[in-house]
A protein has these predicted regions:
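Active-site metal-binding core of divalent-cation-utilizing nuclease and nuclease-like domains
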Residues: 24-47, 101
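Protein kinase-like catalytic core scaffold
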Residues: 46-48, 92-94, 104
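Catalytic cores of nucleic-acid endonucleases
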Residues: 54-101
Length: 110
């Protein structure tokens, strides 16, 4: 399995996890000229912009650490575009890390 396929499977798993917790998935792989958001969900009245990091077996680095300042900037840019075109709402940024050890959901990650 290549990196793209691994990432896609991670996003599918993360979306299923969020749905089981009562969230509604509004968009997947939302792209703009300067950024992409893996998942956009709604939890009550809050929009949740989710970055999914899938770590293949044997990788020990943290998915959260991979969401560096540059990556956060791209996600924020894409979120601004989404809010501009879909209307303002309360929002937060989450990171979901998927690894051989399981799934870890970090709310308000940045």
């Amino acid at each position: 399995m290549n990196i793209r396929e691994t990432g896609l499977l991670g996003e599918i798993r993360a979306a299923a996890y969020l749905r089981r917790r009562g969230m509604r998935i509004l968009a997947r792989r939302y792209r703009t000229a300067h950024g992409e958001i893996d998942l956009i969900a709604r939890e009550g009245t809050t929009l949740v912009f989710v970055e999914v990091k899938t770590r293949p077996r044997g990788r020990l680095d943290s998915g959260l650490a991979a969401v560096n300042a540059e990556k956060r900037g791209h996600i924020r840019y894409a979120a601004r575009e989404y809010l501009r075109t879909h209307g303002q709402a309360a929002f937060r940024f989450d990171v979901i890390e998927i690894s051989a050890a399981g799934l870890r959901h970090m709310k308000n990650a940045f």
